[in-house]
Amino acid sequence: MTGGQIRPGALIRSDSHSRLTPAAAEAVRSQPIARILDLRWSRELAADPSPFFADPFYRHVPLLNDPMGYDPPLDTYAPMLDHNTTRIARAFHEIATAPPGTVVIHCRGGRDRTGALTALLLAVAEVSPAEIAADFARTPGTSPEAMHNTLTHATTRYGGVPNYLTHCGVAPTALAAIRHRLTITA
């Protein structure tokens, strides 16, 4: 990693919070949560409501068009990047403008949508592609190769993740704010 060390507690990825008990939801609320981004589709949220829906730090930001409009391949999230630029830009805006504290990102399973957005965030923080792929592979049912292929696509097609995000409409000031939020610089 060249961007410094990731700030402990700056970013948490998880699966759906709909199964949290009331006590567990209160335990989450007692933490310094700045933003919870729920990346699920509206129909997923309707079927399994978030216990944080009414909290001021909660944002419902579906990361994918519904329907997606493409068949997702198993070995890359490249189509997710190519077909959801506006949604990805909105997620980055919500993170960049969040108050100080922890950002929690989740979808239904905490793998695909959450993993892809987390990878983009870590790339902005200048974490190496190998480290991002290894971090992604810690989630059961994921492949480091899929994330490696996704990051390679961002580099080949857009000239890197920062250029991809600029293409999406994310302002350079937002990228700098996210980098600052996520890292401890030496």
Tell me the role of every PLM-derived stretch.
Residues 1-104, 116-186:
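Cys-dependent protein tyrosine phosphatase-like superfamily
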Residues 109, 113-114:
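Ser/Thr-glycine-rich phosphate-binding loops at phosphate-binding pockets of nucleotides
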